[in-house]
Amino acid sequence: MIEVKNLTKTYGNFVAVKDVSFTAENGSILGFLGPNGAGKTTTMRIITGYMPATAGTVLIDGLDIFSQSLEARRKIGYLPESPPLYPEMRVEAYLRFVAKLRGVPRAKIEPALEHVLEVCGLADMAHRICGQLSKGYRQRVGLAQALIHDPPVLVLDEPTIGLDPRQIHEIRGLIHHLAGNRTVVLSTHILPEVSQICDKVVIIADGRVVLEEYLKKLPAGTSLEDIFLSAITKERHEEGASAEETLEEVGAGHT
């Protein structure tokens, strides 16, 4: 389970993420949906321990990602937007390397390697050089490295971006298969991705959560696209109105 509470990240006067809270339950796939620049990647980096927050807490199966970082990060498999591959390494050598970094016991490395190669459809690619793989297969290797230590939590940042339609279909199917008893957070700006494979959606706009709901509880006859557009339009309207009020107050103070 992932519990995010009142997460805020600022850079000087710029607020990238403000008071973000949501929960991803065990065995579920949560779609973290928002337009480009909404704060999705910043949030993903914070909840995986790769970036500090300005304020707020993140619990990974009850462990604080900030104060119990090593223990919490062992429970996470993370696929960033660009898979962290070494292009000169062969697939199996790279995955063995990651397994050692992740603390997989020596006696369990080969079984773990065999498992992720099979699950991710890479059995025939084990001896291939990472840099010579298609983008779809590089993404599969990225998923394999996130799974090599058998984590209970998977965080995937834009896992299908830049793929062709066939590759997108294959990766979505793979993600759905991998979920099982894991908690999966899938960051994306692609509406069909959420509607096809997710159980729950969190919509973020301008660094704020504007909706958190299970897909099956969305109003009947209303599409996710309608809800998404309505939510981000409302947020931006309220943000604009708030800015206007602030300017009026400042102006009144100078009269």
Protein language model regions, located:
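Conserved ABC ATPase "signature" region
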Residues: 96, 100, 107-125
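A short, surface-exposed alpha-helical micro-motif characterized by mixed small hydrophobic
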Residues: 194-196
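A short, proline-enriched helix->beta-strand linker immediately N-terminal to the Walker B motif
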Residues: 148-152
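Catalytic Walker B motif of ABC-type/P-loop ATPase nucleotide-binding domains
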Residues: 154-158, 163
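ABC ATPase "signature
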Residues: 212-213
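Helical segment within the ABC ATPase nucleotide-binding domain
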Residues: 168-180
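Conserved ABC ATPase signature
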Residues: 129-133
